[in-house]
Protein backbone atom coordinates (compact mmCIF):
# COMPACT_ATOMS: atom_id res chain seq x y z
CA UNK A 1 0.00 0.00 0.00
CA UNK A 2 1.40 3.35 -1.04
CA UNK A 3 1.60 6.23 1.44
CA UNK A 4 -1.04 8.98 1.06
CA UNK A 5 1.72 11.59 0.88
CA UNK A 6 3.06 9.90 -2.28
CA UNK A 7 -0.40 9.89 -3.86
CA UNK A 8 -0.79 13.59 -3.06
CA UNK A 9 2.61 14.38 -4.59
CA UNK A 10 1.70 12.48 -7.76
CA UNK A 11 -1.62 14.35 -7.86
CA UNK A 12 0.17 17.69 -7.45
CA UNK A 13 2.65 16.74 -10.18
CA UNK A 14 -0.10 15.80 -12.63
CA UNK A 15 -2.05 19.01 -12.01
CA UNK A 16 1.04 21.23 -12.23
CA UNK A 17 2.14 19.48 -15.42
CA UNK A 18 -1.25 20.18 -17.01
CA UNK A 19 -1.26 23.84 -15.97
CA UNK A 20 2.34 24.54 -16.97
CA UNK A 21 4.14 22.11 -19.27
CA UNK A 22 1.11 20.97 -21.28
CA UNK A 23 -0.05 24.56 -21.78
CA UNK A 24 3.47 25.48 -22.99
CA UNK A 25 3.69 22.43 -25.25
CA UNK A 26 0.30 23.28 -26.74
CA UNK A 27 1.16 26.90 -27.50
CA UNK A 28 4.60 25.96 -28.84
CA UNK A 29 3.13 23.49 -31.33
CA UNK A 30 4.28 20.23 -29.74
CA UNK A 31 0.79 18.75 -29.38
CA UNK A 32 -1.02 17.66 -32.51
CA UNK A 33 -3.29 14.79 -31.47
CA UNK A 34 -3.91 12.42 -28.57
CA UNK A 35 -0.68 10.46 -28.98
CA UNK A 36 1.49 13.57 -28.80
CA UNK A 37 -0.44 14.61 -25.68
CA UNK A 38 0.25 11.16 -24.21
CA UNK A 39 3.96 11.41 -25.05
CA UNK A 40 4.17 14.89 -23.57
CA UNK A 41 2.43 13.89 -20.32
CA UNK A 42 4.63 10.81 -20.04
CA UNK A 43 7.83 12.81 -20.56
CA UNK A 44 6.94 15.65 -18.20
CA UNK A 45 5.61 13.39 -15.45
CA UNK A 46 8.71 11.16 -15.57
CA UNK A 47 10.88 14.25 -15.39
CA UNK A 48 8.93 16.04 -12.66
CA UNK A 49 8.35 12.95 -10.48
CA UNK A 50 11.69 11.21 -11.13
CA UNK A 51 12.88 11.05 -7.52
CA UNK A 52 9.45 10.10 -6.12
CA UNK A 53 9.03 7.37 -8.74
CA UNK A 54 12.42 5.86 -7.99
CA UNK A 55 12.07 6.00 -4.18
CA UNK A 56 8.67 4.24 -4.29
CA UNK A 57 9.22 1.72 -7.12
CA UNK A 58 6.66 3.51 -9.27
CA UNK A 59 6.47 3.28 -13.04
CA UNK A 60 4.49 5.15 -15.69
CA UNK A 61 3.13 3.03 -18.53
CA UNK A 62 1.20 4.12 -21.62
CA UNK A 63 -1.58 1.86 -22.94
CA UNK A 64 -1.68 -0.17 -19.73
CA UNK A 65 -4.08 -3.10 -20.05
CA UNK A 66 -6.42 -4.11 -17.23
CA UNK A 67 -7.26 -7.68 -18.15
CA UNK A 68 -10.02 -8.09 -15.54
CA UNK A 69 -11.81 -5.01 -16.85
CA UNK A 70 -10.75 -5.51 -20.49
CA UNK A 71 -9.72 -1.87 -20.79
CA UNK A 72 -6.59 -0.06 -21.85
CA UNK A 73 -5.75 3.03 -19.82
CA UNK A 74 -4.01 5.72 -21.85
CA UNK A 75 -1.52 6.17 -18.99
CA UNK A 76 -1.19 4.32 -15.68
CA UNK A 77 1.10 4.95 -12.75
CA UNK A 78 1.77 1.67 -10.97
CA UNK A 79 3.90 0.33 -8.16
CA UNK A 80 6.12 -2.68 -8.70
CA UNK A 81 7.73 -5.05 -6.23
CA UNK A 82 11.26 -5.68 -7.43
CA UNK A 83 11.69 -8.53 -4.92
CA UNK A 84 9.06 -10.71 -6.60
CA UNK A 85 10.80 -13.52 -8.46
CA UNK A 86 8.81 -13.53 -11.69
CA UNK A 87 9.95 -13.53 -15.28
CA UNK A 88 7.48 -10.94 -16.49
CA UNK A 89 7.44 -7.35 -15.31
CA UNK A 90 3.64 -7.36 -15.45
CA UNK A 91 3.63 -9.97 -12.65
CA UNK A 92 5.63 -7.62 -10.42
CA UNK A 93 2.97 -4.88 -10.45
CA UNK A 94 1.39 -4.75 -6.99
CA UNK A 95 -0.71 -1.57 -7.06
CA UNK A 96 -2.24 0.96 -9.44
CA UNK A 97 -1.83 4.51 -8.18
CA UNK A 98 -3.34 6.60 -10.98
CA UNK A 99 -5.09 6.15 -14.31
CA UNK A 100 -5.27 8.79 -17.03
CA UNK A 101 -7.72 8.82 -19.91
CA UNK A 102 -6.93 11.30 -22.66
CA UNK A 103 -8.81 12.87 -25.53
CA UNK A 104 -7.58 15.45 -28.02
CA UNK A 105 -9.88 16.52 -30.80
CA UNK A 106 -10.74 19.52 -32.88
CA UNK A 107 -14.00 18.24 -34.28
CA UNK A 108 -17.42 19.17 -33.06
CA UNK A 109 -19.32 16.17 -34.35
CA UNK A 110 -21.59 13.97 -32.28
CA UNK A 111 -19.04 11.17 -32.79
CA UNK A 112 -16.32 13.23 -31.11
CA UNK A 113 -18.51 14.03 -28.12
CA UNK A 114 -19.55 10.38 -27.89
CA UNK A 115 -15.90 9.26 -27.83
CA UNK A 116 -15.25 11.67 -24.96
CA UNK A 117 -18.35 10.49 -23.11
CA UNK A 118 -17.27 6.85 -23.61
CA UNK A 119 -14.05 7.60 -21.71
CA UNK A 120 -16.14 9.05 -18.88
CA UNK A 121 -18.13 5.81 -18.80
CA UNK A 122 -14.86 3.85 -18.77
CA UNK A 123 -13.70 5.77 -15.68
CA UNK A 124 -17.11 5.36 -14.05
CA UNK A 125 -16.91 1.61 -14.66
CA UNK A 126 -13.39 1.46 -13.18
CA UNK A 127 -14.69 3.11 -10.00
CA UNK A 128 -18.05 1.39 -9.68
CA UNK A 129 -16.70 -2.12 -10.11
CA UNK A 130 -14.44 -1.43 -7.14
CA UNK A 131 -11.67 -3.47 -8.73
CA UNK A 132 -9.48 -0.43 -9.20
CA UNK A 133 -9.41 2.04 -6.31
CA UNK A 134 -7.00 4.75 -7.38
CA UNK A 135 -6.97 8.32 -8.65
CA UNK A 136 -8.35 9.06 -12.12
CA UNK A 137 -7.47 11.94 -14.41
CA UNK A 138 -9.64 12.75 -17.41
CA UNK A 139 -7.62 15.01 -19.71
CA UNK A 140 -9.36 16.60 -22.69
CA UNK A 141 -8.09 19.10 -25.22
CA UNK A 142 -11.13 20.04 -27.28
CA UNK A 143 -10.23 22.59 -29.95
CA UNK A 144 -13.80 23.70 -30.41
CA UNK A 145 -15.85 26.56 -29.04
CA UNK A 146 -17.35 25.41 -25.74
CA UNK A 147 -19.97 26.71 -23.36
CA UNK A 148 -18.09 25.13 -20.45
CA UNK A 149 -14.89 23.12 -20.20
CA UNK A 150 -16.32 20.56 -17.78
CA UNK A 151 -17.47 17.19 -19.08
CA UNK A 152 -18.77 15.78 -15.80
CA UNK A 153 -22.13 16.93 -14.48
CA UNK A 154 -22.96 17.68 -10.82
CA UNK A 155 -24.62 14.30 -10.36
CA UNK A 156 -21.35 12.60 -11.31
CA UNK A 157 -19.06 14.91 -9.34
CA UNK A 158 -21.19 14.60 -6.21
CA UNK A 159 -21.43 10.81 -6.44
CA UNK A 160 -19.16 8.31 -8.19
CA UNK A 161 -16.43 10.83 -9.16
CA UNK A 162 -16.10 12.38 -5.71
CA UNK A 163 -12.82 11.46 -4.05
CA UNK A 164 -11.43 9.85 -7.22
CA UNK A 165 -11.59 12.02 -10.35
CA UNK A 166 -9.89 15.16 -11.61
CA UNK A 167 -10.75 16.75 -14.93
CA UNK A 168 -7.88 18.33 -16.84
CA UNK A 169 -9.69 20.41 -19.44
CA UNK A 170 -8.80 22.62 -22.37
CA UNK A 171 -11.14 24.21 -24.87
CA UNK A 172 -12.08 27.41 -26.59
CA UNK A 173 -14.19 29.94 -24.69
CA UNK A 174 -15.15 33.12 -26.57
CA UNK A 175 -12.43 32.43 -29.14
CA UNK A 176 -9.59 31.95 -26.64
CA UNK A 177 -8.05 28.62 -25.66
CA UNK A 178 -8.29 27.92 -21.91
CA UNK A 179 -6.71 25.23 -19.75
CA UNK A 180 -8.06 24.38 -16.30
CA UNK A 181 -8.00 21.77 -13.56
CA UNK A 182 -11.28 20.67 -11.97
CA UNK A 183 -10.49 18.41 -9.00
CA UNK A 184 -13.21 16.30 -7.42
CA UNK A 185 -10.68 14.13 -5.57
CA UNK A 186 -10.19 16.45 -2.60
CA UNK A 187 -6.45 16.85 -3.15
CA UNK A 188 -4.38 19.88 -4.12
CA UNK A 189 -7.48 21.84 -5.16
Predicted ranges, named:
Residues 75-77, 94-106, 123:
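Conserved catalytic cores of phosphodiester-cleaving nucleases, focusing on short active-site segments
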Residues 10-15, 113-122, 157-162:
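Well-ordered, non-membrane alpha-helical segments in soluble/globular domains
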Residues 54-92:
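Active-site metal-binding core of divalent-cation-utilizing nuclease and nuclease-like domains
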Amino acid sequence: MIDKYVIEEIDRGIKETWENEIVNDYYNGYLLKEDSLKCSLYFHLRTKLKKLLKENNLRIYPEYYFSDLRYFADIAIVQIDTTIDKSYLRDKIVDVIAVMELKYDGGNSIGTENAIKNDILKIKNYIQTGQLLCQYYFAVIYETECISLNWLDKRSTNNWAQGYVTELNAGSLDGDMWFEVNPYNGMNG
